[in-house]
Structures are given as C-alpha cells and as structure tokens.
C-alpha cells in the first residue's frame, strides 16, 4: 500500500512528479496534514531526514487516522494550499467527498507498506479464514481491490 498526496476539492494540485517538485510543494504548502499511523511516521521521517522539518514544523497538523485527516482537509475552513499525505487507499476513499487525489509520492521517495495474511491453524474459525485467503488469491478480485490503492505483490 503506497503513500500519496491529496488536496481539498477545487484547490490547485501541486506538482509532485519528482523529488525536487515534491520538496518545493511541501515548502509552498500553507498546511501539511499527515497521521500518526505508519504512513505519517514515514512522512515525518522524510521531512526530518531531508532537512525540511524546521522549515515546515509550524504548518504540520497530525491526526490519529486517515479518516480524521481527510475529513479535516475536506472542511470549508481548510486553508487554500493545504496538502495531505497518507495511505493511497484512504485518500481514494475520499475522492469526490471534498478531497482530490494528486498522486503517489515520486519514485525517489515512494514507500510501500506491506500487509500479509497468515492463518492460525489452531483457530476455531479456520474455515472462514481459509475462505478469505482463497478470495484474496483470485485474480478477478484484484481489479476491484486495485482501485482502492491496494496492489498485490
């Protein structure tokens, strides 16, 4: 699951096509939203390691989760030029709900969080768990799932 950028509906979509363009967009943003979740920890690490943190610290707003972040971004009081960075799957669920998808982080800093399924062979619910794994292995399911920002490995 990748990390991407969003803006409030109707706002200018910043150029984030390269590392330099993303850095410039971050510096120009009026507000920067990200979460305390894994994607937000990654963004915070980027800002720190790239020497941007001291320049943007006053503009950063962190949220407990992607839903809270994106709801805030979509509100009427959000300053023009605000940008949110988070899990692509969360951003895409808010498309057409006051949030516009800008795109994934540029390839130089792209980040994927990998999730895996595992079965507990001692589980009293092993049958339903095996059925879930079976569904997840079906190629025809991934067309729908990919539209949510989740990609199979």
Regions found by a protein language model. Give the residues of each.
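Exported/periplasmic ABC-transporter solute-binding proteins
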Residues: 1, 6-153
């Amino acid at each position: 699951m990748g990390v991407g950028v969003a803006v409030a509906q109707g706002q200018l979509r910043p150029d984030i096509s390269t590392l330099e363009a993303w850095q410039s967009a971050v510096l120009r943003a009026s507000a920067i939203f990200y979460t305390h979740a894994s994607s937000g920890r990654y963004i915070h690490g980027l800002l720190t390691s790239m020497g941007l943190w001291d320049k943007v610290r006053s503009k950063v707003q962190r949220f407990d989760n992607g839903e809270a972040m994106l709801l805030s971004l979509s509100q009427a009081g959000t300053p023009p030029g605000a940008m949110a960075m988070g899990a692509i799957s969360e951003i895409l669920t808010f498309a057409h709900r006051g949030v516009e998808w800008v795109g994934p982080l540029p390839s130089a800093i792209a980040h994927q969080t990998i999730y895996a399924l595992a079965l507990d062979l001692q589980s009293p619910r092993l049958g339903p768990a095996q059925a879930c794994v079976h569904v997840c292995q079906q190629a025809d399911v991934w067309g729908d799932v990919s539209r949510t920002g989740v990609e199979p490995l």
